[in-house]
């Protein structure tokens, strides 16, 4: 059994710092790097890209709605052409920086509201899928495990990897509990670590309503910007190793 560990990185903006990139990068196998639309400035993004290359971490484009003020967490009703152009712009920008650093973008993981919206909105999902195919049909799409997007993207010809979240609570339908609700984000490192192992071995987790919810995940997202993120990431990695679950990139395994 193996699993990939990913994290959202490159999200600092000028003097405003977000996350713990230097500490999280040695733990993960895939880096979802901001592309400037929800967070990240060119210099900071390039530094994160170079560090990822140095550590042999796979680079992915963390594309978003154009929403710096809302950190990409606000829904936006964009036209199909707008969304396609936005996604193309972001992938190509990050891929250019990756090329300079001696690497390339190998997958796309939408961020925040865009991620949640295309999990169920077929029209916006189609725009994102088409943008990825226009740029490079070999790119892998990271999608919420169990969502309609997984099948939609596969039917469209994309390689898809299903993702689960280590520190997020789930509704019984497999969707993420809104961050606005109490209990949406989990903070107990030991509990989260054992929950990740249980999820992988048993194929699901207990929802916020106490119902077993099936989740088949190929990659686990570790958030680097929450309280205790470093301790939690280390605990998760240690628990995976303890249970003989290999940690390796999902690229070429999608």
UniProtKB/Swiss-Prot annotation:
It catalyses: 5-oxo-L-proline + ATP + 2 H2O = L-glutamate + ADP + phosphate + H(+). It comes from the Bacteria. GO terms for biological process: carbohydrate metabolic process. Pfam families: LamB_YcsF. It is an enzyme of class 3 (hydrolase). One of its GO terms (molecular function) is 5-oxoprolinase (ATP-hydrolyzing) activity. The keyword Hydrolase applies. SUPFAM superfamilies: Glycoside hydrolase/deacetylase. Gene3D superfamilies: Glycoside hydrolase/deacetylase. The keyword Nucleotide-binding applies. Signal peptide: none annotated. Keywords: ATP-binding, Hydrolase, Nucleotide-binding. Its EC number is 3.5.2.9. Catalyzes the cleavage of 5-oxoproline to form L-glutamate coupled to the hydrolysis of ATP to ADP and inorganic phosphate. Belongs to the LamB/PxpA family. Forms a complex composed of PxpA, PxpB and PxpC. This is 5-oxoprolinase subunit A. It comes from Acinetobacter baumannii (strain ATCC 17978 / DSM 105126 / CIP 53.77 / LMG 1025 / NCDC KC755 / 5377). The gene is pxpA.
